[in-house]
């Protein structure tokens, strides 16, 4: 069974790094793991919940424990075989349309740059004039000072 809980030593380490909690703990002569049960639990919880440092420390410790648990669980060879079969069986047709880099005529949209509508579409033919237009537009965009409008406002 997986255990994602912090150890008592990790909790003590987090408590020892937090000054507000230390003030509460300072009421005790020596802090042992069992002494945590003797602390004013409501006060301790309030301090932890109001301390970004304590919360982030606890979250970080829990994440480290979770990552370590996941590393230990990743020894399942059957799942690796299934993953390999899935990747090997993937075809280009299986890839969703949104991930395919291609401009379709039906996907025409109006884009503007400096107030001018850009209606140029890239064709597969590299020698076409539309590719030159796109390169020209890209050059204009790269040379354009976008901070110019911000300064005038």
Curated annotation (Swiss-Prot):
Q: Which UniProt keywords apply?
A: DNA replication, Early protein, Viral DNA replication
* Xref: Pfam families: Phage_Gp17 (PF17549)
Q: Which GO terms describe its biological process?
A: DNA replication; viral DNA genome replication
Q: Which domain of life is it from?
A: Viruses
| Cystine bridges | none
Q: Which InterPro entries match?
A: Phage_Gp17
* Keyword Isomerase among record annotations: no
Q: What does this protein do?
A: Involved in the replication of viral DNA. It is required at the very beginning of the virus amplification, conditions in which a low number of viral DNA molecules enter the host cell, possibly to recruit the limiting amount of initiation factors at the replication origins. Once the infection process is established and the other replication proteins reach optimal concentration, it becomes dispensable. Optimizes the binding of protein p6 at the viral DNA ends, thus favoring the initiation of replication.
Record note on quaternary structure: Homodimer. Interacts with the histone-like protein p6; this interaction optimizes the binding of protein p6 at the viral DNA ends, thus favoring the initiation of replication.
Similarity remark:
Belongs to the phi29likevirus protein p56 family.
> Which protein are we looking at?
DNA replication protein 17
| Organism from which the protein derives | Bacillus phage phi15 (Bacteriophage phi-15)
Lineage at the top is: Viruses, Duplodnaviria, Heunggongvirae, Uroviricota, Caudoviricetes
Chain's gene name: 17
């Amino acid at each position: 069974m997986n255990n994602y809980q912090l150890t008592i030593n990790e909790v003590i380490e987090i408590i020892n790094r937090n000054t507000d909690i230390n003030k509460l703990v300072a009421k005790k002569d020596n802090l042992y793991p069992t002494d945590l049960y003797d602390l004013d639990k409501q006060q301790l919880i309030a301090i932890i919940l109001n301390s970004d440092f304590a919360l982030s420390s606890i979250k970080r410790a829990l994440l480290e424990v979770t990552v370590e648990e996941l590393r230990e669980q990743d020894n399942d060879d059957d799942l690796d075989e299934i993953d390999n079969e899935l990747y090997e069986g993937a075809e280009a047709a299986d890839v969703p349309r949104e991930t395919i880099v291609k401009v379709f005529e039906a996907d025409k949209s109006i884009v503007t740059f400096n107030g001018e509508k850009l209606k140029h579409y890239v064709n597969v033919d590299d020698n076409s004039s539309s590719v030159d237009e796109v390169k020209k537009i890209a050059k204009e965009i790269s040379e354009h000072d976008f901070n110019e409008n911000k300064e005038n406002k």
